[in-house]
Amino acid sequence: MSTPLRSTPLVAPGHTRPITHLSFSPIQDDSSFLLVSSCKDGNPMLREWTGDWIGTFLGHKGAVWSTKLSLDGSRAASGSADFTAKVWDTYSGNCLHSFPHNHIVRSVALSPQATHLLTGGQEKKIRIFDLNRPDAEPEYLFDSGLLSHDGTIKSVVWVGDHTGVTAGDDGKVKWWDLRSRELTKTIAYSDPITSMELSLPTQRLVVTSGKNVEFIPALPHSGHNTHSLTLRYAPSSASIHPILQDRFVTGSMSDEWVRVHSINGEERDVLKGHHGPVHCVEFSPDGEMYASGSEDGTIRLWQTTPGKTYGLWQGTSTNGH
């Protein structure tokens, strides 16, 4: 019986401190896509789908906790411990806007047309900035009093044209109508939310809280059901295969491994290579690989199907995807 091929990761170097967040763009018109990484070194990095470095966004004065790309890949937004959120031109690397906050910005999200920016962090307040009127005061989303959450906001995502979803240390996931600025739904968990990411192709939110992974319909009235799993460890981050939806990957703060699970929770693989806890994982939009970011300061790219010619594995494929 032949031994299954093991995934040999590609290591994307360049950062000097722990990786805090990873985010891929959607697949672009030329079939490529981009990867952006956040790091405590304060310098978000942009990479091609192969992992090759394109450039570094220079300007933050503190750790960067979140960086996300616009749908067309032309803009990036970042949130930092320097109390700012910034918007960048991904072609030139120039900072287009810098928005001051009163505390650490933990998460950012751009609207589908990259006309607005959603931010959240340790102020426990959700702000909406109009990028066409960058000097205008932001609008706020408040639940009770002058706060959006009762704890640090760990993640914000923009769903469709008019929905914002936020998650925090208070264990709550909240849906907001961004036209009326009203709260429309809340789900409460017993543990703080450690991560929440939007899987754009599947239109699901992947949420980690305690030892639980939740796959939640991004829009509450879509007719899809929530799929809930309890693992034997507490994941720091999780990401679902964007096409097959038959598996998900996780990182954990309790060890240095990346794990692959079937959608029913069965552990399929344990991938070793990092030299520190794994803070974040993310599937590429074509499902052919997933990226992991660690306390060790490296990004590792893992093949979904080891042995397949893809990207820089076994030479560059002629058609890429």
Predicted segments, located by residue:
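Conserved strand-to-loop turn within each blade of WD40 beta-propeller repeats
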Residues: 38-41, 78-82, 120-123, 167-170, ...
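Beta-strand-rich domains and repeat architectures in extracellular enzymes and scaffolds
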Residues: 11-42
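Per-blade loop-tip surfaces of WD-repeat and WD-like beta-propellers in eukaryotic adaptors/scaffolds
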Residues: 2-8, 30-32, 46-63, 87-105, ...
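C-terminal, well-structured subdomains that either form a transmembrane helix-short loop-helix hairpin
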Residues: 279-289
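Structural WD40 beta-propeller signal
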Residues: 25, 70-72, 111-113, 159, ...
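Conserved blade-ending motifs and adjacent loop-strand segments that build the rim/top face
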Residues: 230-236, 267-280
